[in-house]
C-alpha cells in the first residue's frame, strides 16, 4: 500500500507529461483473428530461439481459441528501418486480442503476450503503451533500437501505466501491477531536444516484474531535462543489467521496496534520484561522470523526508562530485527516515562520499568504503535505539557467498548463443498445456529427455496440469513463455500430514545444478498436502531460479477464486486449503540461488473485474534449511504460519525481501487451519501471537539481510490498523513479526515493518518499539545486529 499524492509524484519528475484519453472499461483492441494477410504472416526467423520456436503457446482460459500469445512486431507492420514511424505497429502488437489494457481491467491471467522485437532500428513518434501480463523482448543477439523521434511528446517512450488526460487517473493501481517484463532493448532519446520532456521508460511496478538488459541513451547537454527510467509508485520489483547514459537523471524513482542489480549510469547530472521509498537495495552500481551519483534529499531535513532507507553495496563511483546527497540528521522528521547503509564501495576521484544537509559527513577521494551508515541502530544484541552516523561493524561475509569479494550474482540465462536444435518443446513432446488434460506423463518425459540430452526444455505458454510430482533432475534447464504455469491438482497432494512436492528439484542427497526461468507453479482446488517447490540439490555455483513464481489461487482454472473461496470472515472452507508449504530448500540443498521470485498465496482474484478478495489457506511460506543460499528480490506473502523461516540455515544472503501477513488473521488465529508440527520446526503459537511471523530465524547462523520489509496491513480484513492517519503513527495490526531464536551472527540493514508494535523479538524478548523508528510510513531500522 502507498498513500501518496499523485501530483507530488509527477512534480518530482520535473518533466511535462503528455497523457492519453481516458477510457473506462471500454476495450477498443482488435481480435487476433482480424489481422490482414500481411500482418498474419509467420514470424521471420532471425536466429533467436524464442522467436524461431514461437507459435505453439496457448492461453487456455481465454474465450478466443485463436488468441495469439507470441507476437512479432514485424507481423503487425513494423519496419525497423529507422525511417518509418513504427509506433502504431508496436501498439497493435501489444493490444491485439481484447487484452487487459489501461482502464479496461484491473488484472487478468487469460491474455498474456510476448511482444518480440527483431534486430533493427524502430522510429517511435508516439508512446508504446504497455498492457497487463506483457513481456516486451528484443533479440539479445543484436539488441534492437527504439529511437525516439524528435517530435515525440509523451510521458515516456514506453509507458507502463499512462495517465488519463481527463482526470489524471492512472491506467492501473500500481501496487497491483504484476507479471510484466522488458528485456534486450536499446532506447535512444538523443534526437529529442534537451529541454523537451523525454523519459525512456515509465514503470510503476509491483511483484513479478523486471527490466533486464536495457541500454538507454540520452542527450548530454547541460540543460537536459531527460530521465532514463521514471518510477513514481508501486510495490516492486526488480531491475538488472542496465546501462544508461546522459540526461538530467539516469533514474528518477520511487517505490515501496525494490532491488536493483548491476546498473551502469554515466554522464547524467544526477545518476539516481530517489524520489521516495520505504526501502531499496542497490548492488553493483557503476556510476561515473555525474554531478551527484545518488540523491535522497526529497522532502529535506526541515520538512518531512520522503525517503525511508537505501542500502548500497558492492558498487563503484567514479569522477562524480558527490556519491550520496542526503538530508538525514539526529532530528530527522520522521525519526526513522533518511537512513543509509553503504558497504564495499570503491570511489575514484569523488571528493565527497556522503553529504548531509549540505555538509560533507564522509570525505571521499580515491578509496574503498568498508561499511558506513546513518540512522537508527540496534546493536549489539538488538540493544537500542541509538542514532548513528559513521563507520559501523560491517557484516563478516562468508566466503561461500562471494565471488571476487562481492556477493555472488548471476543474471537470468537467455540462451542467446543456442540454436533451436538445443531445445525441446513441451508441447512438441505431447503436453497440451490446456489446463484440463492431465499432462503429468508428458511433462515428466520432456523434463527427463531434456536433461539427459543436455537440452533446454521450453514450456510454451499454457497451464500444464499435473497430478503427481514432477522430478527435475540435475542438469535440467527449463524456460517458460510469459509465465507458463505448472498446476498441481488431485489427491496426491491432499494430505497435510504427508506432504508431497509438485516440483521436486533433485532428490535428497543428489548434487548438480539446474536453471529455471519465467514460469509459475500453482495449485488447483484443495491440495493441503502440496509442497509447491522442493529444492534438494547440493548445487554448484550458479544453480537457481530466475523469475519463477508461485501463485496459489486467484486465477482462472485454479478453482480457488471468488466463487469457491470468498473472503467471508470466520468461514474457513476446506476446499480452499491450498498448500502445506510454498517453497522448501531442504537440508543439504546448499548453493541454491533465487532472483526475482514472488511466492504468493492470493489475497484477491486476478481475473475478477473488481479484484475481489478471497480466502486461500497455505501453511508455510519460504522454508530454508540449507547453507550458502542467495535470495535476491524476493517476496513471500499470506501464509498462515510464517512467510520466511531460516531453520538451522547458515550463510544466507537476502535482499530485498518482503512479506505480508494474511489479511484474514487473526480469524482464524495462526496456525489455523493448519497444525503446527515439530517435524517441520513450526512455530508454537500463544494468545499473544495470533498472526503469522514475517521472518523467523531458528538456530540460524551468518544471516545477512540487505533490505527487508515485513508488512501487516489488516486485522480481520480491517485496514484501519495500518491507516496513514493513525494517531501518532501507531499502526497495530499485530504485536510482533520478526523472531530470532537461538541464532547467531545476524545482521540486517535497512529493515522496515508496517502495522507492528514490536519490530524485533529476540530470545523471546520484545525489542525495537515502533514509536522509536517511525519512518515515511513504515517503521525502519538502519542497522540491526544480534548474536555476536
UniProtKB/Swiss-Prot annotation:
User: EC no.?
Assistant: 3.2.1.58
Q: Which keywords, in A-to-Z order, does the entry hold? A: Cell wall biogenesis/degradation, Glycoprotein, Glycosidase, Hydrolase, Signal
Q: GO molecular function of the protein, one example?
A: glucan exo-1,3-beta-glucosidase activity
The signal sequence is 1-42
Task: Tell me which species this is from.
Answer: Cochliobolus carbonum (Maize leaf spot fungus)
The question of whether Protein biosynthesis is a record keyword is answered with no
Cited InterPro entries: Pectin_lyas_fold, Pectin_lyase_fold/virulence, QRT3-like, RHGA/B-epi-like_pectate_lyase, Rhodanese-like_dom
Question: Which family is this sequence assigned to?
Answer: Belongs to the glycosyl hydrolase 55 family.
Tell me the domain of life.
Eukaryota
User: Where in the sequence does glycosylation occur per the annotation?
Assistant: 28, 233, 381, 773
What is one GO biological process annotated to this record?
cell wall organization
What is the protein name stated in its UniProt record?
Glucan 1,3-beta-glucosidase
* Gene3D superfamilies according to UniProt: Single-stranded right-handed beta-helix, Pectin lyase-like (2.160.20.10)
One Pfam family from the record: Pect-lyase_RHGA_epim
Task: State the reactions this protein catalyses.
Answer: Successive hydrolysis of beta-D-glucose units from the non-reducing ends of (1->3)-beta-D-glucans, releasing alpha-glucose
Q: Which gene encodes it?
A: EXG1
Amino acid at each position: 500500500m502507498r498513500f501518496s499524492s499523485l501530483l507530488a509524484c509527477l512534480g518530482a519528475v520535473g518533466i511535462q507529461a503528455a497523457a492519453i484519453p481516458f477510457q473506462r472499461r471500454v476495450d477498443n483492441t482488435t481480435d487476433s483473428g482480424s489481422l490482414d494477410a500481411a500482418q498474419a504472416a509467420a514470424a521471420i526467423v532471425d536466429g533467436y530461439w524464442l522467436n524461431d520456436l514461437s507459435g505453439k503457446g496457448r492461453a487456455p482460459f481465454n474465450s478466443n481459441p485463436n488468441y495469439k500469445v507470441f507476437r512479432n512486431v514485424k507481423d503487425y507492420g513494423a519496419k525497423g528501418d529507422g525511417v518509418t514511424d513504427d509506433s502504431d505497429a508496436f501498439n497493435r502488437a501489444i493490444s491485439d486480442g481484447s487484452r487487459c489494457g489501461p482502464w479496461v481491467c484491473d488484472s487478468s491471467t487469460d491474455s498474456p503476450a510476448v511482444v518480440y522485437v527483431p534486430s533493427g532500428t524502430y522510429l517511435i513518434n508516439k508512446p508504446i503503451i504497455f498492457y497487463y501480463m506483457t513481456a516486451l523482448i528484443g533479440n539479445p543477439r543484436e539488441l534492437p533500437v527504439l529511437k525516439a523521434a524528435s517530435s515525440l511528446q509523451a510521458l515516456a517512450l514506453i509507458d507502463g501505466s499512462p495517465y488519463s488526460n481527463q482526470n489524471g487517473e492512472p491506467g492501473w493501481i500500481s501496487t497491483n501491477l504484476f507479471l510484466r517484463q522488458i528485456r534486450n532493448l536499446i532506447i535512444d532519446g538523443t534526437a529529442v531536444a534537451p529541454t523537451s520532456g523525454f523519459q525512456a521508460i515509465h514503470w510503476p511496478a509491483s511483484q513479478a516484474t523486471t527490466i533486464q538488459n536495457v541500454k538507454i541513451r540520452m542527450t548530454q547537454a547541460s540543460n537536459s531535462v531527460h530521465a532514463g527510467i521514471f518510477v513514481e509508485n508501486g510495490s516492486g520489483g526488480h531491475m538488472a543489467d542496465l546501462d544508461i547514459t546522459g540526461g538530467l537523471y539516469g533514474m528518477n524513482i520511487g517505490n515501496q521496496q525494490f532491488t536493483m542489480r548491476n546498473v551502469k549510469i554515466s554522464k547524467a547530472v544526477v545518476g539516481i534520484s530517489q524520489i521516495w521509498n520505504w526501502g531499496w537495495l542497490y548492488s553493483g552500481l557503476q556510476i561515473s561522470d555525474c554531478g551527484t551519483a545518488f540523491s535522497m534529499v526529497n522532502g529535506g531535513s526541515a520538512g518531512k523526508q520522503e525517503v525511508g532507507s537505501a542500502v548500497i553495496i558492492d558498487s563503484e563511483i567514479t569522477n562524480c562530485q558527490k556519491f550520496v546527497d542526503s538530508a538525514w540528521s539526529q532530528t530527522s522528521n520522521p525519526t526513522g527516515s533518511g537512513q543509509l547503509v553503504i558497504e564495499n564501495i570503491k570511489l575514484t576521484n569523488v571528493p565527497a562520499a556522503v553529504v548531509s544537509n549540505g555538509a560533507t559527513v564522509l570525505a571521499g577521494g580515491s578509496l574503498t568504503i568498508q561499511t558506513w551508515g546513518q540512522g537508527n541502530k540496534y546493536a549489539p544484541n538488538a540493544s537500542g535505539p541509538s542514532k548513528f552516523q559513521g563507520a559501523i561493524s560491517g557484516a563478516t561475509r562468508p566466503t561461500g557467498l562471494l565471488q571476487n569479494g562481492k556477493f555472488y550474482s548471476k543474471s537470468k540465462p537467455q540462451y542467446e548463443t543456442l540454436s533451436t536444435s538445443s531445445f525441446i518443446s513441451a508441447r512438441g513432446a505431447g503436453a497440451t498445456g490446456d489446463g484440463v488434460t492431465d499432462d503429468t506423463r508428458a511433462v515428466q518425459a520432456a523434463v527427463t529427455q531434456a536433461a539427459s540430452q543436455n537440452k533446454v526444455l521450453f514450456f510454451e505458454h499454457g497451464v500444464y496440469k499435473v497430478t503427481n510430482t514432477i522430478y527435475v533432475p540435475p542438469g535440467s534447464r527449463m524456460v517458460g513463455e510469459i509465465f507458463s504455469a505448472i498446476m498441481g491438482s488431485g489427491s496426491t497432494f491432499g494430505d497435510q500430514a504427508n506432504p508431497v512436492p509438485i516440483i521436486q528439484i533433485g532428490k535428497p542427497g543428489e548434487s548438480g545444478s539446474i536453471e529455471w526461468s519465467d514460469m509459475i507453479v500453482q495449485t488447483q482446488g484443495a491440495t493441503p498436502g502440496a509442497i509447491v517447490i522442493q529444492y534438494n540439490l547440493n548445487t554448484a555455483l550458479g544453480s537457481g531460479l530466475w523469475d519463477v513464481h508461485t501463485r496459489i489461487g486467484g486465477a482462472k482454472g485454479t478453482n480457488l477464486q471468488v466463487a469457491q473461496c470468498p473472503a467471508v470472515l470466520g468461514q474457513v472452507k476446506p476446499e480452499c486449503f491450498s498448500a502445506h508449504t510454498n517453497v522448501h530448500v531442504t537440508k543439504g540443498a546448499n548453493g541454491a540461488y533465487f532472483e526475482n521470485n514472488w511466492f504468493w498465496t492470493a489475497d484477491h482474484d486476478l481475473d475478477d473485474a473488481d479484484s475481489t478478495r478471497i480466502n486461500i489457506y497455505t501453511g508455510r511460506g519460504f522454508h530454508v534449511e540449507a547453507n550458502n543460499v542467495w535470495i535476491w528480490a524476493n517476496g513471500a506473502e499470506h501464509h498462515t504460519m510464517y512467510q520466511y523461516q531460516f531453520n538451522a540455515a547458515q550463510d544466507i544472503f537476502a535482499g530485498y525481501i518482503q512479506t505480508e501477513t494474511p489479511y484474514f488473521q487473526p480469524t482464524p488465529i495462526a496456525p489455523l487451519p493448519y497444525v503446527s508440527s515439530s517435524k517441520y520446526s513450526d512455530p508454537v503459537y500463544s494468545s499473544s501471537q495470533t498472526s503469522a511471523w514475517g521472518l523467523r530465524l531458528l538456530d540460524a547462523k551468518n544471516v545477512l539481510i540487505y533490505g527487508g520489509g515485513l508488512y501487516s496491513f489488516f486485522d480481520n480484513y480491517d485496514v484501519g490498523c495500518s491507516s496513514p492517519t493513525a494517531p501518532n503513527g501507531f499502526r497495530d495490526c499485530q504485536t510482533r513479526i520478526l523472531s530470532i531464536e537461538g541464532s547467531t551472527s545476524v545482521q540486517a540493514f535497512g529493515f522496515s515493518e508496517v502495522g507492528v508494535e514490536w519490530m524485533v523479538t529476540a530470545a523471546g524478548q520484545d525489542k525495537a518499539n515502533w514509536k522509536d523508528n517511525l519512518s515515511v510510513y513504515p517503521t525502519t531500522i538502519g542497522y540491526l545486529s544480534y548474536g555476536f
